[in-house]
């Protein structure tokens, strides 16, 4: 095989590896994220139906009616202590699972649950809540459950992707140079650093909970807007489905971005382990390739200067 042919072969192999990671991201989205968001959408729909069900004699309800306070005996029927206890038990399970998740992720999970518990405790102390507020609390509980599962599932997925990418790049490098040698298996702590310590100080965990906060606020605002406009149950349901679609699109972007990032980080770490000093940036040139990637295609960089997600 000539030098040009050999380079072409290895270039294709690198691009094939990138394509494999893209396919892995799509499989994860279909088998995991799509199912979770569909279930959350169903549960949120049920909460909206409960709100409208309080006024079953009407096709629509006003914002004034939705803001009517639940007091006295009806308020006492709400099992606030049970809901708070359930949240605390979930926090305890998260803490007991320490070792399966990084401390940073565990702290983020606990923080979100504690904030919701404090809010429910405040309603208990106040002794009253509106029909709308009650449904908003229940919807936030559903969303928190959704993003808890996202945190855990996405971490496990990225952990697996890093290890797979690292070993594949070590193998490819050894194949390229024509001999094998011993290499260090990445520790759990090293994998966590790769996943959580991005150059831009962002990571999947922080981004997910930003999504959760934004989505909860979005749902609250859209419920109020729909009620002010006197929308029917069907129109309100369509409004919330639309917002769920926006949230799912954000989740898809995150999975794809983090998959690309972790592939590049695993490749960099494998190159360093194998003593590679330089690498060539290769981009799949098609209609989806960004202008920045087009400009970097074919350029060479020192491995020690590599910044996954940037070059």
Regions found by a protein language model. Name each.
Residues 1-241:
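N-terminal leader/targeting and assembly helices and adjacent pre-domain segments
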Residues 245-311:
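Acidic, glycine-rich two-metal-ion catalytic cores of nucleic acid-processing enzymes
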